[in-house]
Amino acid sequence: MHIPVLIDSLIENLNIREDGIYVDLTLGRGGHAAAILSKLTTGLLIVFDKDEKAIEESKERLLAISKNVIFIWEDFRNFAVELEKRQIYKVDGFIMDLGVSSPQIDQGERGFSYTKNARLDMRMNQNQELDAHHVVNNYNQDLLTKVLQNYGELKNARSLTKAIIDSRPINTTFELVNLIRSSSPAALLRKKNIVKNVFQAIRIEVNDELGALEAFLSLFISYLKQDSQVAIITFHSLEDRIVKMKFKSLLISSKTHLFDPRAQQFSVKTIKPSTSEIQLNKRSKSAKLRILSKNY
């Protein structure tokens, strides 16, 4: 059974108003969306996903809860354009559950999982051209090294890149997994899950995940009402660092000389999963929920 990560903490801290407007930017299987929608009466939930299958698979479930939901098949980096098309200029809350969703991992043919053999793909939006096969088989040494260093945080990125280029063509996930393991030092393999990091790096590149996150963070503030929240769940240090620094910059820019926290325009809270949640849902182990509240 799919369990949404940090669901109780997210719902508790969103302070959901029954007549509010909320935006779920990463629908996935719809667990967070369903919890929000069930608390709305006259309010509205707008859900985004760049993966059309996510919308198809969640639509019936959400509409059974309430008809007050709008489905948008689009990259969340374009949220502002889509909201304004619908004459929505202020919302009560945004939520994001970043990274790859459980269905994308579970569907082996999508090529996201290094434990399932499939053609190298990793596209969240199946209509886009760039896929993992192109990255692995066509990027030059400098570009591929940069991807592995920046998005996989791999110290052996250059030697891995050379091994990949020397072994082309590489067509499947298992071919790539075997190559990574055979070309990495044993000591490094024992210390770090290099395969996981390589797959993460390629996935981030294919879907421009960090670029989309930065695009959202550059725009969302002007869409927040008074007493509203943005809640973002991250799963690795790269995306978490971006969110943390943005929230920190907002805190600094709105800082007052008063000691009363209610005088601050913004406040921030960070929540990690409990031991019991991690035991129930292993995916939550690396999760971190950051919540920014706009107080006025």
Curated annotation (Swiss-Prot):
It is found in: Cytoplasm. Keywords: Cytoplasm, Methyltransferase, rRNA processing, S-adenosyl-L-methionine, Transferase. One of its GO terms (molecular function) is rRNA (cytosine-N4-)-methyltransferase activity. GO terms for biological process: rRNA base methylation. GO terms for cellular component: cytoplasm. It comes from the Bacteria. S-adenosyl-L-methionine binds at residues 30-32, 49, 97, 104. It is an enzyme of class 2 (transferase). It catalyses: cytidine(1402) in 16S rRNA + S-adenosyl-L-methionine = N(4)-methylcytidine(1402) in 16S rRNA + S-adenosyl-L-homocysteine + H(+). Its EC number is 2.1.1.199. Belongs to the methyltransferase superfamily. RsmH family. Specifically methylates the N4 position of cytidine in position 1402 (C1402) of 16S rRNA. NCBIfam families: 16S rRNA (cytosine(1402)-N(4))-methyltransferase RsmH (TIGR00006). This is Ribosomal RNA small subunit methyltransferase H. It comes from Mesomycoplasma conjunctivae (strain ATCC 25834 / NCTC 10147 / HRC/581). The gene is rsmH.
